Amino acid sequence: SSIIFPLITFPYVSRILLPEGVGKVSLATSVVSYFSLIAQLGIPTYGIRVSAKVRDNKEELVSCTQELLIINIIMSVISYIGYFSMVFLIDKLANEKCLYIVMSTTILLNSIGIEWLYKGLEQYTYITIRSIAFKILALIALFLFVHQRSDYVLYGAISVLAASLSNVLNFINARKYIFQRSYRKLQFRR
């Protein structure tokens, strides 16, 4: 799905938004990607390993998931501070504030996404179905709403939703791993 959908969307988007609109969204995506990477702090890779290791111990799994989620949210707040400082201080970025604010939701949605938990628990069918469903919805939204050169912010929002809305579903679906009460203290050092 990561290869097929761009093959369908790119010709349409480049014809409608032209190089200028596509370039604005690509620059915003690149900037957000760096801050999202900082916010994630390697947690996805570590989270897969830890959740796979403790998946048979429910209490340990709940604790590890909570600890990693808290760390991820704290790092996202720090990353947001740096991101918005940069957006408002650099004129080229400040001129496109709306686009950069819309694109910044990627940082938040990635922090609550906890896809690493599902990979650690080897729930690949869920991951695949969810990912394809949201990409199809985004494809439909793209063809319905992006019709003019000025729709580049809307295109940015749709691309964020295509990539990150599944993280909201992950968070809602993971309530059995996050919102259970753990009877041991959280340990942020492991």
Listing of model-derived features with the role each one plays in the protein:
Residues 1-5, 59, 66, 188-190:
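N-terminal membrane topogenesis motif
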Residues 125, 152-159, 168-190:
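Interhelical loop/hinge segments that connect adjacent transmembrane helices in multipass membrane
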